[in-house]
């Protein structure tokens, strides 16, 4: 039984195995209707719980479709239905769910909730997102880069904006997949030292550059994310916009990167805030391939968790 909790907690060779599996499964589905089952149906007879303490579109749809394509069934539970940690303990919830399902995916706020779920579950647990990390997204991003440009090892990845949970998982991936990483954004939104330190300990070049044009110079991949959350009050939104406006990914900034550089955004996006529509719909952008690859990467993760 394998939990998928964070990229840095997973063996490098096993990450490579998952990545190769994701590429192969995507290729095998070419030309198939989206509702048609995979030929081998590896999840036939299996039940997967999808827990959403934090709502999502891409995570819910991609996991649900992925399980169904592999022949399994899903049980989708919202935070309101679960009341995680209120009344029944997370530990007891994990033990009970383990009697009903073969695999648990949880998208939650606190990392502690994920870790407690994994500690007490007797079935594999997948991190669908926490406030600290988002490993499933980065597996899809690495897959997308490989699909378009080949190996990501030795490449320069630049993150522009807020050093958030997706940025943190990119730093984990830098250490595991062997690429260099530059963060450009205001000092108040730097990624946590723990994540930067991990990538550096693994021998990767990690730099922080306040000038976005200097940061993006020679980049192979430029990535950004939303500046605000749906839960942020208006005052916080205005403050964030003022802080981050210099780090918008626009055509002038992308022109500083390599001519064949890619642009990614995990979506949903606030168009013309963190990135302009000209970039999002332009020749560097692979955002919709990136979104599709959540499906294939997560299918590979589920197979690995179950030893299939």
UniProtKB/Swiss-Prot annotation:
Reactions catalysed, as given in the entry: carbamoyl phosphate + L-ornithine = L-citrulline + phosphate + H(+)
Pfam families reported in the protein's UniProt record: OTCace, OTCace_N
Residues annotated as binding carbamoyl phosphate: 56-59, 83, 107, 134-137, 266-267, 294
Pathway this chain belongs to: Amino-acid biosynthesis; L-arginine biosynthesis; L-arginine from L-ornithine and carbamoyl phosphate: step 1/3
GO biological process: arginine biosynthetic process via ornithine; citrulline biosynthetic process; L-arginine biosynthetic process
GO cellular component: a single term: cytoplasm
Residues annotated for L-ornithine binding in this entry: 165, 225, 229-230
Gene3D superfamilies xref list: Aspartate/ornithine carbamoyltransferase
Keyword Membrane found: no
Source organism of this protein record: Cereibacter sphaeroides (strain ATCC 17029 / ATH 2.4.9)
PANTHER family for the chain: ORNITHINE CARBAMOYLTRANSFERASE, MITOCHONDRIAL, ORNITHINE TRANSCARBAMYLASE, MITOCHONDRIAL
Compartments, record wording: Cytoplasm
The protein, known as: Ornithine carbamoyltransferase
Record's function text: Reversibly catalyzes the transfer of the carbamoyl group from carbamoyl phosphate (CP) to the N(epsilon) atom of ornithine (ORN) to produce L-citrulline.
Major subcellular site: cytoplasm
GO MF terms, alphabetically ordered: amino acid binding; ornithine carbamoyltransferase activity
Family assignment from sequence similarity: Belongs to the aspartate/ornithine carbamoyltransferase superfamily. OTCase family.
EC number: 2.1.3.3
SUPFAM superfamilies: Aspartate/ornithine carbamoyltransferase (SSF53671)
Root EC class: transferase
Keywords: Amino-acid biosynthesis, Arginine biosynthesis, Cytoplasm, Transferase
